[in-house]
């Protein structure tokens, strides 16, 4: 079975399901009608897991490389809507949260943080954080209705069987609990071709309407939806080292650009003009509250 032991090696590897595939044979996935990976069998899921298990950890130099600071984005598009009707986040699940950097804006509002993570290098418990190793099939080893809040910051697109994982997130949330989902809404390039540097072997984004449908099929209500990341501004961030999503101005300007170019959205983008459209979504989901008459 293939493994990804470094960012360089991981970028060169790809899932065996892609061997011999073409744009034509993958057209149902590139068109956004289906989500690639969601129909994989257990052996295919296991291969994907081994390719992705440590890939992000290696891309960020085993956790030593600085990640962009997205605190303002996470607050304005996610946490503030959860905290609008309650004083704290309670018991929180961070799926694929690595070192937990996405919780900086709200750490004092968390009763206890549980992080489910595939990369063993991140698994270091402390007084306020408990780590658990991610299961190959995405199942969560927690009781029903255990968490008040679940946070998934750019992690679901690294997982093949997303339908199952969304159902697990729904299961472990208390009625009335919130689930934050931040994900790319493009293919992230052609999967059957060589991957761009900096991408993990199997990651792919979501067709935005399909992601909505999948969340709703799992049982969630969509409370709020924000499209963001206008690609030219991403190049400003990466090229100049500006934390655009920790800036009130840059975040607002980016969201405005995405609203103005929403008409140009498509999932699979093959030229520069098609890339002038929002490329990420931030969803605030809620598990419906229990019926008082039950």
Language model segments and positions:
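A short glycine-rich, Lys/Arg-flanked "PGG" loop and its adjoining helix->strand segment in the class I
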Residues: 163-178
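A C-terminal cap/extension of S-adenosyl-L-methionine-dependent methyltransferases
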Residues: 2-5, 15, 131, 230-294
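Conserved class I S-adenosyl-L-methionine
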Residues: 2-87, 105, 178-204
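Class I SAM-dependent methyltransferase SAM/SAH-binding core
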Residues: 93-139
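A short beta-strand submotif of the Rossmann-like class I SAM-dependent methyltransferase core
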Residues: 152-155
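Short alpha-helix
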Residues: 203-219, 224-225
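A short acidic, Gly/Pro-enriched loop at the edge of an enzyme's catalytic core
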Residues: 138-150
């Amino acid at each position: 079975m293939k493994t990804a032991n470094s960012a360089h090696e991981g970028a060169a590897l790809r899932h065996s399901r892609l061997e011999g595939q073409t744009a034509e044979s993958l057209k149902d996935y590139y068109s956004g009608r289906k989500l690639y990976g969601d129909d994989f069998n257990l052996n295919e899921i296991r291969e994907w897991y081994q390719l992705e298990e440590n890939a992000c950890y290696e891309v960020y130099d085993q956790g030593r490389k600085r990640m962009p600071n997205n605190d303002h984005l996470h607050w304005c598009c996610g946490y503030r809507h959860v905290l609008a009707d309650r004083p704290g986040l309670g018991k929180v699940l961070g799926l694929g949260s690595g070192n937990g950097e996405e919780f900086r804006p709200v750490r004092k509002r968390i009763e206890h943080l549980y992080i489910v993570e595939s990369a063993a290098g991140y698994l270091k418990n402390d007084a306020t954080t408990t780590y658990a190793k991610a299961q190959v099939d995405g199942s969560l080893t927690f009781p029903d209705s255990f968490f008040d809040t679940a946070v998934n910051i750019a992690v679901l697109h690294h997982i093949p069987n997303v339908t199952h994982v969304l159902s697990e997130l729904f299961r472990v949330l208390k009625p009335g609990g919130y689930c934050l989902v931040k994900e790319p809404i493009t293919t992230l390039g052609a999967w059957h071709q060589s991957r761009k540097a900096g991408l993990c072997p199997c990651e792919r984004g979501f067709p935005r309407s399909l992601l909505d449908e999948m969340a709703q099929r799992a049982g969630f209500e969509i409370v709020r939806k924000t499209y963001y990341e206008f690609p030219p501004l991403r190049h400003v961030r990466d090229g100049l080292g500006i934390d655009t999503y920790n800036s009130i101005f840059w975040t607002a300007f980016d969201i405005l650009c995405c609203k103005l170019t929403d008409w140009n959205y498509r999932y699979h983008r093959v030229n520069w003009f098609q890339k002038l459209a929002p490329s990420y979504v931030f969803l605030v989901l809620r598990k419906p509250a229990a019926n008082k008459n039950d």
